[in-house]
UniProtKB/Swiss-Prot annotation:
Keywords: Cell inner membrane, Cell membrane, GTP-binding, Hydrolase, Membrane, Nucleotide-binding, Protein biosynthesis
Annotated protein name in UniProt: Elongation factor 4
PANTHER family: TRANSLATION FACTOR GUF1 HOMOLOG, CHLOROPLASTIC, TRANSLATION FACTOR GUF1-RELATED
Record gene name: lepA
CDD domains for this protein: EF4_II, EF4_III, LepA, lepA_C
Membrane topology designation: Peripheral membrane protein
Xref: InterPro entries: EF-4, EFG_III/V, EFG_V-like, EFTu-like_2, G_TR_CS, LepA_C_sf, LepA_CTD, LepA_IV
Organism: Marinobacter nauticus (strain ATCC 700491 / DSM 11845 / VT8)
Gene Ontology MF terms in the entry: GTP binding; GTPase activity; guanosine tetraphosphate binding; ribosome binding; translation elongation factor activity
Primary localization class, coarse: membrane
Protein backbone atom coordinates (compact mmCIF):
# COMPACT_ATOMS: atom_id res chain seq x y z
CA UNK A 1 0.00 0.00 0.00
CA UNK A 2 1.61 3.24 -1.18
CA UNK A 3 0.79 6.41 0.72
CA UNK A 4 -0.80 9.18 -1.32
CA UNK A 5 2.22 11.41 -0.74
CA UNK A 6 4.38 8.91 -2.65
CA UNK A 7 2.18 8.63 -5.76
CA UNK A 8 2.70 10.81 -8.83
CA UNK A 9 0.30 10.77 -11.79
CA UNK A 10 1.65 12.48 -14.87
CA UNK A 11 1.52 12.48 -18.64
CA UNK A 12 3.89 13.74 -21.31
CA UNK A 13 2.92 16.53 -23.69
CA UNK A 14 5.06 16.73 -26.80
CA UNK A 15 4.85 17.43 -30.50
CA UNK A 16 5.17 14.56 -33.00
CA UNK A 17 8.80 13.35 -33.09
CA UNK A 18 10.01 15.30 -30.09
CA UNK A 19 10.90 12.06 -28.33
CA UNK A 20 7.94 11.37 -26.06
CA UNK A 21 7.69 7.62 -26.64
CA UNK A 22 11.48 7.20 -26.37
CA UNK A 23 11.50 9.03 -23.03
CA UNK A 24 8.74 6.69 -21.85
CA UNK A 25 10.92 3.72 -22.87
CA UNK A 26 13.78 5.08 -20.72
CA UNK A 27 11.48 5.53 -17.71
CA UNK A 28 10.34 1.93 -18.02
CA UNK A 29 13.95 0.72 -18.26
CA UNK A 30 15.21 2.73 -15.28
CA UNK A 31 12.32 1.60 -13.09
CA UNK A 32 12.74 -2.03 -14.15
CA UNK A 33 9.32 -2.42 -15.72
CA UNK A 34 10.67 -4.76 -18.39
CA UNK A 35 13.85 -6.78 -18.69
CA UNK A 36 16.33 -5.66 -21.33
CA UNK A 37 15.30 -8.61 -23.48
CA UNK A 38 11.63 -7.58 -23.58
CA UNK A 39 12.46 -3.96 -24.21
CA UNK A 40 11.26 -2.98 -27.68
CA UNK A 41 11.49 0.54 -29.04
CA UNK A 42 8.32 2.51 -28.31
CA UNK A 43 6.92 -0.07 -25.92
CA UNK A 44 3.71 1.86 -25.40
CA UNK A 45 2.80 2.21 -29.07
CA UNK A 46 1.21 -1.21 -29.10
CA UNK A 47 -0.76 -0.90 -32.35
CA UNK A 48 1.20 -1.95 -35.47
CA UNK A 49 -0.16 1.14 -37.11
CA UNK A 50 1.35 3.34 -34.39
CA UNK A 51 4.78 1.83 -34.92
CA UNK A 52 4.69 2.05 -38.70
CA UNK A 53 3.71 5.69 -38.76
CA UNK A 54 5.81 6.52 -35.71
CA UNK A 55 2.90 8.28 -34.01
CA UNK A 56 0.97 7.62 -30.83
CA UNK A 57 -2.77 7.24 -31.42
CA UNK A 58 -4.23 5.75 -28.25
CA UNK A 59 -3.50 6.75 -24.69
CA UNK A 60 -1.75 4.02 -22.69
CA UNK A 61 -0.87 3.82 -19.02
CA UNK A 62 2.05 2.37 -17.07
CA UNK A 63 2.66 2.07 -13.34
CA UNK A 64 6.32 2.14 -12.30
CA UNK A 65 8.10 2.01 -8.96
CA UNK A 66 11.03 4.40 -8.75
CA UNK A 67 13.53 4.44 -5.90
CA UNK A 68 14.40 8.11 -5.57
CA UNK A 69 17.66 9.59 -4.28
CA UNK A 70 16.00 10.42 -0.94
CA UNK A 71 15.66 6.67 -0.34
CA UNK A 72 11.85 6.61 -0.70
CA UNK A 73 10.14 4.45 -3.33
CA UNK A 74 7.61 6.40 -5.39
CA UNK A 75 4.80 4.96 -7.45
CA UNK A 76 4.69 6.73 -10.82
CA UNK A 77 1.57 6.39 -12.94
CA UNK A 78 2.44 7.56 -16.39
CA UNK A 79 -0.21 8.04 -19.08
CA UNK A 80 1.08 8.28 -22.63
CA UNK A 81 -0.74 10.77 -24.87
CA UNK A 82 -0.83 11.34 -28.62
CA UNK A 83 0.69 14.50 -30.11
CA UNK A 84 -1.21 14.87 -33.37
CA UNK A 85 -3.85 17.59 -33.69
CA UNK A 86 -6.57 15.11 -34.69
CA UNK A 87 -6.18 13.29 -31.38
CA UNK A 88 -6.30 16.27 -29.07
CA UNK A 89 -9.40 14.88 -27.31
CA UNK A 90 -7.36 11.79 -26.36
CA UNK A 91 -4.92 14.17 -24.70
CA UNK A 92 -7.55 16.00 -22.68
CA UNK A 93 -8.92 12.65 -21.45
CA UNK A 94 -5.49 11.52 -20.32
CA UNK A 95 -4.88 14.80 -18.54
CA UNK A 96 -8.02 14.31 -16.42
CA UNK A 97 -6.25 11.45 -14.66
CA UNK A 98 -3.08 13.41 -13.85
CA UNK A 99 -1.84 16.08 -11.45
CA UNK A 100 1.00 17.16 -13.67
CA UNK A 101 2.50 16.96 -17.12
CA UNK A 102 5.99 16.95 -18.58
CA UNK A 103 6.28 19.32 -21.52
CA UNK A 104 8.95 17.70 -23.69
CA UNK A 105 10.48 20.04 -26.27
CA UNK A 106 13.12 19.19 -28.85
CA UNK A 107 16.10 21.43 -27.99
CA UNK A 108 16.93 21.74 -31.68
CA UNK A 109 13.52 22.49 -33.19
CA UNK A 110 11.90 24.51 -30.45
CA UNK A 111 8.23 24.86 -29.56
CA UNK A 112 5.54 23.62 -31.98
CA UNK A 113 1.90 24.68 -32.26
CA UNK A 114 0.35 21.44 -31.01
CA UNK A 115 2.45 21.33 -27.85
CA UNK A 116 1.23 24.87 -27.21
CA UNK A 117 -2.41 23.85 -27.61
CA UNK A 118 -2.05 20.74 -25.41
CA UNK A 119 -0.10 22.74 -22.85
CA UNK A 120 -2.93 25.26 -22.54
CA UNK A 121 -5.37 22.36 -22.08
CA UNK A 122 -3.21 21.10 -19.20
CA UNK A 123 -2.95 24.53 -17.57
CA UNK A 124 -6.73 25.04 -17.89
CA UNK A 125 -7.28 21.74 -16.07
CA UNK A 126 -5.03 23.00 -13.26
CA UNK A 127 -2.06 20.71 -13.90
CA UNK A 128 1.53 21.52 -12.93
CA UNK A 129 3.53 21.71 -16.18
CA UNK A 130 7.23 20.77 -15.92
CA UNK A 131 9.33 21.69 -18.99
CA UNK A 132 12.00 19.24 -20.21
CA UNK A 133 14.49 19.91 -23.01
CA UNK A 134 15.10 16.69 -24.95
CA UNK A 135 17.59 15.68 -27.67
CA UNK A 136 20.51 17.42 -25.94
CA UNK A 137 22.89 14.97 -27.66
CA UNK A 138 22.25 16.58 -31.06
CA UNK A 139 24.83 19.08 -32.32
CA UNK A 140 22.07 21.55 -33.29
CA UNK A 141 20.60 21.70 -29.76
CA UNK A 142 20.19 25.30 -28.51
CA UNK A 143 18.75 24.96 -25.00
CA UNK A 144 19.00 28.68 -24.11
CA UNK A 145 17.06 29.80 -27.18
CA UNK A 146 14.39 27.11 -26.73
CA UNK A 147 13.98 27.87 -23.01
CA UNK A 148 13.38 31.51 -23.90
CA UNK A 149 10.91 30.42 -26.57
CA UNK A 150 8.91 28.31 -24.07
CA UNK A 151 8.70 31.34 -21.81
CA UNK A 152 7.76 33.65 -24.68
CA UNK A 153 5.06 31.48 -26.27
CA UNK A 154 3.60 29.45 -23.40
CA UNK A 155 4.50 31.69 -20.50
CA UNK A 156 5.97 29.14 -18.07
CA UNK A 157 9.42 29.62 -16.57
CA UNK A 158 11.85 27.25 -18.29
CA UNK A 159 15.16 28.66 -17.05
CA UNK A 160 15.77 25.67 -14.75
CA UNK A 161 14.23 23.08 -17.11
CA UNK A 162 15.91 19.67 -16.97
CA UNK A 163 18.06 18.90 -20.00
CA UNK A 164 18.21 15.31 -21.14
CA UNK A 165 18.62 13.01 -24.08
CA UNK A 166 16.07 10.21 -24.08
CA UNK A 167 17.94 8.35 -26.79
CA UNK A 168 21.26 8.09 -24.94
CA UNK A 169 19.66 8.04 -21.48
CA UNK A 170 21.59 11.15 -20.39
CA UNK A 171 19.83 13.12 -17.65
CA UNK A 172 16.70 10.94 -17.62
CA UNK A 173 17.03 10.26 -13.87
CA UNK A 174 17.14 14.02 -13.29
CA UNK A 175 13.80 14.24 -15.10
CA UNK A 176 12.30 11.71 -12.67
CA UNK A 177 13.74 13.55 -9.65
CA UNK A 178 12.43 16.88 -10.94
CA UNK A 179 9.02 15.36 -11.56
CA UNK A 180 8.77 14.03 -7.99
CA UNK A 181 9.75 17.47 -6.63
CA UNK A 182 7.44 19.59 -8.76
CA UNK A 183 4.30 17.53 -9.45
CA UNK A 184 1.90 17.41 -6.47
CA UNK A 185 0.64 14.06 -5.11
CA UNK A 186 -3.01 13.11 -5.74
CA UNK A 187 -5.74 14.03 -3.26
CA UNK A 188 -8.36 11.54 -2.16
CA UNK A 189 -9.80 9.76 0.84
CA UNK A 190 -9.37 5.99 0.94
CA UNK A 191 -12.06 5.50 3.56
CA UNK A 192 -14.71 7.31 1.49
CA UNK A 193 -17.13 5.47 -0.87
CA UNK A 194 -15.57 4.45 -4.18
CA UNK A 195 -15.45 6.86 -7.13
CA UNK A 196 -13.45 5.97 -10.22
CA UNK A 197 -13.34 7.70 -13.60
CA UNK A 198 -13.17 5.63 -16.79
CA UNK A 199 -10.42 7.19 -18.92
CA UNK A 200 -10.46 4.67 -21.74
CA UNK A 201 -12.03 1.31 -22.62
CA UNK A 202 -11.36 -1.29 -25.25
CA UNK A 203 -12.87 -4.62 -26.20
CA UNK A 204 -11.05 -7.88 -25.57
CA UNK A 205 -12.51 -10.97 -27.23
CA UNK A 206 -11.97 -13.09 -24.10
CA UNK A 207 -12.50 -10.66 -21.23
CA UNK A 208 -15.15 -8.37 -22.70
CA UNK A 209 -14.76 -4.67 -21.94
CA UNK A 210 -11.47 -3.67 -20.27
CA UNK A 211 -11.58 -0.19 -18.70
CA UNK A 212 -8.66 2.02 -17.74
CA UNK A 213 -9.71 3.89 -14.58
CA UNK A 214 -8.39 6.57 -12.25
CA UNK A 215 -9.61 5.99 -8.67
CA UNK A 216 -10.33 9.37 -7.08
CA UNK A 217 -11.95 8.28 -3.80
CA UNK A 218 -12.17 5.02 -1.86
CA UNK A 219 -10.81 1.58 -2.75
CA UNK A 220 -11.69 -0.82 -5.57
CA UNK A 221 -11.07 -4.48 -4.73
CA UNK A 222 -11.37 -7.65 -6.77
CA UNK A 223 -14.82 -9.22 -6.24
CA UNK A 224 -16.51 -5.90 -5.37
CA UNK A 225 -20.03 -5.31 -6.64
CA UNK A 226 -19.72 -2.20 -8.78
CA UNK A 227 -22.20 -0.03 -10.66
CA UNK A 228 -21.52 2.01 -13.80
CA UNK A 229 -23.34 5.27 -13.03
CA UNK A 230 -24.89 6.10 -16.42
CA UNK A 231 -26.24 2.60 -17.16
CA UNK A 232 -27.15 1.85 -13.49
CA UNK A 233 -26.16 -1.81 -14.08
CA UNK A 234 -24.30 -3.80 -11.41
CA UNK A 235 -21.27 -5.95 -12.22
CA UNK A 236 -18.68 -8.02 -10.42
CA UNK A 237 -15.10 -6.74 -10.58
CA UNK A 238 -13.38 -9.92 -11.80
CA UNK A 239 -9.89 -8.58 -12.46
CA UNK A 240 -8.28 -5.49 -11.00
CA UNK A 241 -4.71 -4.46 -11.67
CA UNK A 242 -2.16 -2.16 -13.25
CA UNK A 243 -0.05 -2.08 -16.40
CA UNK A 244 3.67 -2.23 -15.80
CA UNK A 245 3.59 -2.26 -18.98
CA UNK A 246 2.18 -5.80 -19.08
CA UNK A 247 -1.21 -6.19 -17.36
CA UNK A 248 -0.53 -7.36 -13.78
CA UNK A 249 -3.30 -8.30 -11.32
CA UNK A 250 -2.95 -6.42 -8.03
CA UNK A 251 -6.50 -7.22 -6.82
CA UNK A 252 -6.82 -3.72 -5.34
CA UNK A 253 -6.73 -0.11 -6.59
CA UNK A 254 -6.81 2.73 -4.08
CA UNK A 255 -7.54 6.44 -4.29
CA UNK A 256 -4.85 8.06 -6.44
CA UNK A 257 -4.13 4.91 -8.46
CA UNK A 258 -4.51 4.39 -12.19
CA UNK A 259 -5.21 0.84 -13.34
CA UNK A 260 -7.59 -1.44 -15.17
CA UNK A 261 -10.78 -3.22 -14.21
CA UNK A 262 -12.53 -6.10 -16.00
CA UNK A 263 -16.09 -6.83 -14.97
CA UNK A 264 -17.23 -9.29 -17.63
CA UNK A 265 -19.19 -6.61 -19.48
CA UNK A 266 -19.98 -8.02 -22.91
CA UNK A 267 -22.17 -5.15 -24.10
CA UNK A 268 -20.02 -2.67 -25.96
CA UNK A 269 -21.86 0.34 -24.54
CA UNK A 270 -21.72 -1.02 -20.99
CA UNK A 271 -18.80 1.13 -19.80
CA UNK A 272 -18.69 4.41 -21.70
CA UNK A 273 -15.56 6.53 -21.47
CA UNK A 274 -15.93 9.43 -19.02
CA UNK A 275 -18.36 7.48 -16.83
CA UNK A 276 -18.04 6.91 -13.09
CA UNK A 277 -17.71 3.55 -11.29
CA UNK A 278 -19.16 3.33 -7.75
CA UNK A 279 -19.89 0.62 -5.19
CA UNK A 280 -23.34 -0.93 -5.42
CA UNK A 281 -24.31 -0.22 -1.81
CA UNK A 282 -23.49 3.50 -2.15
CA UNK A 283 -24.64 3.74 -5.78
CA UNK A 284 -27.46 6.22 -5.13
CA UNK A 285 -25.72 8.79 -2.94
CA UNK A 286 -22.30 8.81 -4.65
CA UNK A 287 -22.27 11.63 -7.22
CA UNK A 288 -20.91 11.28 -10.75
CA UNK A 289 -17.49 12.73 -11.47
CA UNK A 290 -17.41 15.53 -14.03
CA UNK A 291 -16.70 13.64 -17.25
CA UNK A 292 -15.34 14.88 -20.54
CA UNK A 293 -17.11 17.08 -23.01
CA UNK A 294 -18.21 15.13 -26.07
CA UNK A 295 -16.15 16.02 -29.10
CA UNK A 296 -17.99 16.86 -32.28
CA UNK A 297 -16.77 15.23 -35.47
CA UNK A 298 -15.42 17.76 -37.98
CA UNK A 299 -15.23 15.65 -41.13
CA UNK A 300 -17.84 13.28 -42.53
CA UNK A 301 -17.37 10.57 -45.14
CA UNK A 302 -19.33 7.57 -46.38
CA UNK A 303 -17.74 4.16 -45.79
CA UNK A 304 -19.12 1.23 -47.77
CA UNK A 305 -18.11 -2.45 -47.73
CA UNK A 306 -16.96 -3.65 -51.17
CA UNK A 307 -19.13 -6.76 -50.88
CA UNK A 308 -22.62 -6.30 -49.47
CA UNK A 309 -22.27 -9.50 -47.38
CA UNK A 310 -19.79 -7.75 -45.09
CA UNK A 311 -22.37 -5.19 -43.94
CA UNK A 312 -23.11 -6.86 -40.57
CA UNK A 313 -19.44 -7.49 -39.78
CA UNK A 314 -18.77 -3.88 -40.69
CA UNK A 315 -21.39 -2.66 -38.22
CA UNK A 316 -19.95 -4.83 -35.41
CA UNK A 317 -16.45 -3.58 -36.19
CA UNK A 318 -17.60 0.05 -36.01
CA UNK A 319 -19.31 -0.58 -32.68
CA UNK A 320 -16.15 -2.11 -31.21
CA UNK A 321 -14.10 0.82 -32.46
CA UNK A 322 -16.47 3.42 -30.97
CA UNK A 323 -15.91 1.81 -27.59
CA UNK A 324 -12.18 2.39 -27.96
CA UNK A 325 -12.51 5.72 -29.74
CA UNK A 326 -15.27 7.84 -28.29
CA UNK A 327 -15.09 10.50 -30.99
CA UNK A 328 -16.09 8.24 -33.87
CA UNK A 329 -19.68 8.75 -34.98
CA UNK A 330 -21.61 6.64 -37.49
CA UNK A 331 -25.13 6.20 -38.90
CA UNK A 332 -26.46 3.92 -41.68
CA UNK A 333 -26.57 5.36 -45.18
CA UNK A 334 -27.36 3.96 -48.60
CA UNK A 335 -26.11 5.14 -51.95
CA UNK A 336 -27.36 4.25 -55.43
CA UNK A 337 -23.80 3.73 -56.61
CA UNK A 338 -22.32 1.89 -53.62
CA UNK A 339 -25.20 0.14 -51.86
CA UNK A 340 -25.50 0.05 -48.06
CA UNK A 341 -22.86 1.49 -45.75
CA UNK A 342 -22.34 4.05 -43.00
CA UNK A 343 -21.88 7.80 -42.84
CA UNK A 344 -19.03 8.27 -40.36
CA UNK A 345 -17.82 11.38 -38.56
CA UNK A 346 -14.12 11.90 -37.80
CA UNK A 347 -11.96 14.53 -36.12
CA UNK A 348 -9.80 15.13 -39.16
CA UNK A 349 -8.23 13.47 -42.17
CA UNK A 350 -5.54 11.60 -40.22
CA UNK A 351 -8.21 10.21 -37.89
CA UNK A 352 -10.20 9.09 -40.93
CA UNK A 353 -7.20 7.31 -42.47
CA UNK A 354 -6.34 5.62 -39.19
CA UNK A 355 -9.91 4.40 -38.63
CA UNK A 356 -10.10 3.07 -42.17
CA UNK A 357 -6.78 1.26 -41.78
CA UNK A 358 -7.80 -0.16 -38.41
CA UNK A 359 -11.05 -1.46 -39.88
CA UNK A 360 -9.22 -3.06 -42.78
CA UNK A 361 -6.49 -4.57 -40.60
CA UNK A 362 -8.05 -5.51 -37.31
CA UNK A 363 -11.41 -6.56 -38.74
CA UNK A 364 -10.34 -7.72 -42.18
CA UNK A 365 -12.80 -5.62 -44.21
CA UNK A 366 -12.53 -4.17 -47.72
CA UNK A 367 -13.94 -0.65 -47.78
CA UNK A 368 -14.70 2.11 -50.25
CA UNK A 369 -14.56 5.69 -48.95
CA UNK A 370 -16.36 8.66 -50.46
CA UNK A 371 -14.95 12.18 -50.44
CA UNK A 372 -14.91 13.72 -46.96
CA UNK A 373 -17.06 16.80 -46.33
CA UNK A 374 -17.54 19.14 -43.39
CA UNK A 375 -20.92 20.18 -41.94
CA UNK A 376 -22.64 23.08 -43.69
CA UNK A 377 -25.58 25.11 -42.43
CA UNK A 378 -28.33 25.70 -44.97
CA UNK A 379 -31.12 28.25 -44.50
CA UNK A 380 -34.12 27.47 -46.71
CA UNK A 381 -36.57 29.99 -48.17
CA UNK A 382 -39.08 28.83 -45.53
CA UNK A 383 -36.63 30.04 -42.90
CA UNK A 384 -35.62 26.69 -41.39
CA UNK A 385 -31.95 25.90 -40.72
CA UNK A 386 -30.58 22.48 -41.72
CA UNK A 387 -27.21 20.87 -41.03
CA UNK A 388 -25.91 19.06 -44.09
CA UNK A 389 -23.00 16.62 -43.82
CA UNK A 390 -23.59 14.87 -47.14
CA UNK A 391 -23.61 16.70 -50.50
CA UNK A 392 -26.29 14.41 -51.92
CA UNK A 393 -28.69 15.50 -49.15
CA UNK A 394 -28.42 19.16 -50.09
CA UNK A 395 -31.86 20.64 -50.91
CA UNK A 396 -32.61 21.95 -54.40
CA UNK A 397 -30.69 25.17 -55.23
CA UNK A 398 -33.95 27.06 -55.82
CA UNK A 399 -35.15 26.48 -52.25
CA UNK A 400 -31.94 27.68 -50.54
CA UNK A 401 -31.85 31.19 -49.07
CA UNK A 402 -28.20 31.05 -47.93
CA UNK A 403 -25.47 28.53 -47.15
CA UNK A 404 -22.97 28.90 -44.34
CA UNK A 405 -19.65 27.14 -44.08
CA UNK A 406 -17.67 26.43 -40.90
CA UNK A 407 -14.69 28.72 -40.28
CA UNK A 408 -11.71 27.70 -38.14
CA UNK A 409 -9.07 29.80 -36.45
CA UNK A 410 -5.66 28.36 -37.28
CA UNK A 411 -2.53 29.08 -35.26
CA UNK A 412 0.56 28.50 -37.34
CA UNK A 413 4.15 28.62 -36.06
CA UNK A 414 6.64 28.94 -38.91
CA UNK A 415 10.36 29.82 -39.22
CA UNK A 416 10.83 33.30 -40.73
CA UNK A 417 12.47 32.09 -43.94
CA UNK A 418 9.35 30.11 -44.94
CA UNK A 419 6.84 32.82 -44.01
CA UNK A 420 6.14 33.91 -47.61
CA UNK A 421 5.22 30.42 -48.83
CA UNK A 422 2.90 29.79 -45.90
CA UNK A 423 1.11 33.14 -46.30
CA UNK A 424 0.67 32.45 -50.03
CA UNK A 425 -0.84 29.04 -49.22
CA UNK A 426 -3.27 30.55 -46.69
CA UNK A 427 -4.38 33.18 -49.22
CA UNK A 428 -4.94 30.48 -51.84
CA UNK A 429 -7.14 28.63 -49.35
CA UNK A 430 -9.36 31.74 -48.93
CA UNK A 431 -7.82 32.61 -45.56
CA UNK A 432 -8.09 35.95 -43.73
CA UNK A 433 -5.08 37.02 -41.68
CA UNK A 434 -5.92 38.01 -38.10
CA UNK A 435 -2.56 38.40 -36.41
CA UNK A 436 1.19 38.06 -36.90
CA UNK A 437 3.68 37.94 -34.03
CA UNK A 438 7.47 37.77 -34.59
CA UNK A 439 9.57 35.83 -32.07
CA UNK A 440 13.31 35.08 -32.02
CA UNK A 441 13.41 32.79 -35.07
CA UNK A 442 9.75 31.91 -35.57
CA UNK A 443 6.60 33.78 -36.55
CA UNK A 444 3.22 33.05 -35.02
CA UNK A 445 0.44 33.53 -37.60
CA UNK A 446 -3.27 33.53 -36.86
CA UNK A 447 -5.60 32.95 -39.80
CA UNK A 448 -9.30 32.35 -40.23
CA UNK A 449 -9.83 29.70 -42.90
CA UNK A 450 -12.83 27.73 -44.21
CA UNK A 451 -12.75 24.32 -42.51
CA UNK A 452 -13.37 22.56 -45.82
CA UNK A 453 -10.02 23.86 -47.07
CA UNK A 454 -8.20 22.88 -43.89
CA UNK A 455 -9.38 19.29 -43.51
CA UNK A 456 -8.59 18.16 -47.03
CA UNK A 457 -4.83 18.46 -47.46
CA UNK A 458 -3.86 21.71 -45.76
CA UNK A 459 -1.70 19.94 -43.20
CA UNK A 460 0.43 18.24 -45.88
CA UNK A 461 0.60 21.35 -48.04
CA UNK A 462 1.75 23.56 -45.15
CA UNK A 463 4.45 21.03 -44.26
CA UNK A 464 5.73 20.98 -47.84
CA UNK A 465 5.56 24.78 -48.14
CA UNK A 466 7.83 25.12 -45.10
CA UNK A 467 10.08 22.06 -45.58
CA UNK A 468 8.34 20.39 -42.65
CA UNK A 469 9.09 23.15 -40.13
CA UNK A 470 5.69 24.82 -39.80
CA UNK A 471 3.22 23.44 -37.29
CA UNK A 472 -0.51 23.95 -37.14
CA UNK A 473 -3.28 23.87 -34.60
CA UNK A 474 -6.87 24.85 -35.33
CA UNK A 475 -10.28 25.09 -33.69
CA UNK A 476 -13.79 25.84 -34.92
CA UNK A 477 -15.03 29.44 -34.46
CA UNK A 478 -18.32 29.99 -36.29
CA UNK A 479 -20.46 29.44 -39.37
CA UNK A 480 -20.22 32.16 -42.01
CA UNK A 481 -22.30 32.81 -45.09
CA UNK A 482 -20.57 31.82 -48.37
CA UNK A 483 -21.38 31.38 -52.04
CA UNK A 484 -21.39 27.59 -52.22
CA UNK A 485 -22.75 25.21 -54.85
CA UNK A 486 -23.10 21.48 -55.28
CA UNK A 487 -20.95 20.02 -58.02
CA UNK A 488 -22.43 16.80 -59.45
CA UNK A 489 -20.68 14.25 -61.62
CA UNK A 490 -22.77 12.64 -64.37
CA UNK A 491 -21.64 9.52 -66.17
CA UNK A 492 -23.61 8.94 -69.38
CA UNK A 493 -26.24 11.30 -68.04
CA UNK A 494 -26.66 9.47 -64.71
CA UNK A 495 -25.84 11.31 -61.52
CA UNK A 496 -23.35 9.41 -59.31
CA UNK A 497 -24.40 10.42 -55.79
CA UNK A 498 -21.18 9.29 -54.14
CA UNK A 499 -19.08 11.70 -56.22
CA UNK A 500 -20.94 14.94 -55.42
CA UNK A 501 -18.94 17.78 -53.82
CA UNK A 502 -19.85 21.08 -52.18
CA UNK A 503 -17.50 23.80 -53.48
CA UNK A 504 -17.20 27.58 -53.59
CA UNK A 505 -18.79 28.99 -56.76
CA UNK A 506 -15.58 30.80 -57.81
CA UNK A 507 -13.67 27.52 -57.79
CA UNK A 508 -16.42 25.33 -59.24
CA UNK A 509 -15.37 25.47 -62.91
CA UNK A 510 -11.74 24.72 -62.16
CA UNK A 511 -12.60 22.00 -59.68
CA UNK A 512 -15.13 20.43 -62.05
CA UNK A 513 -12.63 20.33 -64.89
CA UNK A 514 -9.87 18.85 -62.73
CA UNK A 515 -12.20 16.23 -61.32
CA UNK A 516 -13.52 14.89 -64.60
CA UNK A 517 -10.06 14.94 -66.22
CA UNK A 518 -8.96 12.75 -63.34
CA UNK A 519 -12.02 10.50 -63.77
CA UNK A 520 -11.26 10.11 -67.46
CA UNK A 521 -7.91 8.51 -66.63
CA UNK A 522 -9.48 6.11 -64.16
CA UNK A 523 -12.65 4.85 -65.83
CA UNK A 524 -11.81 1.90 -68.10
CA UNK A 525 -12.81 2.17 -71.79
CA UNK A 526 -15.93 0.28 -72.86
CA UNK A 527 -17.41 -0.76 -76.21
CA UNK A 528 -19.23 2.59 -76.37
CA UNK A 529 -18.39 6.25 -75.67
CA UNK A 530 -18.74 7.34 -72.05
CA UNK A 531 -19.59 10.99 -71.41
CA UNK A 532 -18.37 12.34 -68.07
CA UNK A 533 -19.85 15.70 -67.10
CA UNK A 534 -19.52 18.05 -64.16
CA UNK A 535 -22.70 20.01 -63.50
CA UNK A 536 -24.05 22.61 -61.10
CA UNK A 537 -27.81 22.06 -60.96
CA UNK A 538 -28.76 21.74 -64.63
CA UNK A 539 -25.82 23.72 -65.99
CA UNK A 540 -22.95 21.54 -67.26
CA UNK A 541 -19.63 23.22 -66.46
CA UNK A 542 -17.31 20.80 -68.25
CA UNK A 543 -17.33 17.52 -70.10
CA UNK A 544 -14.92 14.85 -71.34
CA UNK A 545 -15.52 11.66 -73.31
CA UNK A 546 -13.87 8.31 -72.75
CA UNK A 547 -13.58 7.03 -76.33
CA UNK A 548 -14.94 3.60 -77.23
CA UNK A 549 -12.74 0.64 -77.99
CA UNK A 550 -13.07 -0.35 -81.65
CA UNK A 551 -13.38 -3.99 -82.55
CA UNK A 552 -12.44 -4.70 -86.13
CA UNK A 553 -15.48 -6.68 -87.36
CA UNK A 554 -14.42 -6.68 -91.01
CA UNK A 555 -11.16 -8.51 -90.35
CA UNK A 556 -12.64 -11.84 -91.49
CA UNK A 557 -13.55 -10.55 -94.97
CA UNK A 558 -10.70 -11.23 -97.39
CA UNK A 559 -11.61 -9.17 -100.45
CA UNK A 560 -15.24 -9.79 -101.40
CA UNK A 561 -18.05 -7.31 -101.94
CA UNK A 562 -18.11 -3.95 -100.14
CA UNK A 563 -21.79 -4.51 -99.20
CA UNK A 564 -20.69 -7.45 -97.03
CA UNK A 565 -18.43 -5.10 -95.02
CA UNK A 566 -21.17 -2.46 -94.83
CA UNK A 567 -23.58 -5.03 -93.43
CA UNK A 568 -21.12 -6.02 -90.68
CA UNK A 569 -20.34 -2.41 -89.78
CA UNK A 570 -24.07 -1.56 -89.70
CA UNK A 571 -24.69 -4.53 -87.40
CA UNK A 572 -21.88 -3.36 -85.10
CA UNK A 573 -23.33 0.16 -85.04
CA UNK A 574 -26.75 -1.13 -83.95
CA UNK A 575 -25.18 -3.34 -81.31
CA UNK A 576 -23.29 -0.35 -79.88
CA UNK A 577 -26.46 1.74 -79.84
CA UNK A 578 -28.30 -0.96 -77.90
CA UNK A 579 -25.33 -1.41 -75.59
CA UNK A 580 -25.24 2.30 -74.84
CA UNK A 581 -28.89 2.22 -73.77
CA UNK A 582 -28.49 -0.82 -71.52
CA UNK A 583 -24.81 -0.75 -70.61
CA UNK A 584 -23.90 0.58 -67.20
CA UNK A 585 -20.44 1.83 -66.38
CA UNK A 586 -18.54 0.31 -63.46
CA UNK A 587 -16.86 3.10 -61.52
CA UNK A 588 -13.65 1.75 -59.92
CA UNK A 589 -12.67 2.49 -56.31
CA UNK A 590 -9.79 4.77 -57.43
CA UNK A 591 -12.30 7.09 -59.08
CA UNK A 592 -14.04 7.76 -55.75
CA UNK A 593 -10.69 8.62 -54.21
CA UNK A 594 -9.84 10.91 -57.15
CA UNK A 595 -12.16 13.45 -55.57
CA UNK A 596 -9.73 13.76 -52.65
CA UNK A 597 -6.75 14.45 -54.86
CA UNK A 598 -8.30 17.16 -57.01
CA UNK A 599 -6.38 20.08 -55.48
CA UNK A 600 -2.94 18.76 -56.16
Amino acid sequence: MTELSRIRNFSIIAHIDHGKSTLADRFIQICGGLTDREMAEQVLDSMDLERERGITIKAQSVTLNYKAKDGETYKLNFIDTPGHVDFSYEVSRSLYACEGALLVVDAGQGVEAQSVANCYTAIEQGLEVVPVLNKMDLPQAEPERVAAEIEDIIGIDASDAVRCSAKSGLGVEDVLEDLIKKIPPPKGDRSAPLQALIIDSWFDNYLGVVSLVRVTEGVLRKGDKIVIKSTKKAWNADKVGVFNPKPTDTDVLEAGDVGFVVAGIKDIHGAPVGDTIVHQKFAEETPMLPGFKKVKPQVYAGLFPVSADDYDDFRDALEKLTLNDASLFFEPENSDALGFGFRCGFLGMLHMEIIQERLEREYDLDLITTAPTVIYEVVTKQGETLSVDNPSRLPDIGSIEEMREPIVEANILVPQEHLGNVIALCEEKRGVQKNMHFMSTQVQLTYELPMAEVVMDFFDRIKSASRGFASLDYHFVRFQSANLVRLDVLINGDRVDALALIVHRDLSHRKGRQLIEKMKELIPRQMFDIAIQAAIGTQVVSRVTVKALRKNVTAKCYGGDVSRKKKLLQKQKEGKKRMKQLGNVEVPQEAFLAVLKVDN
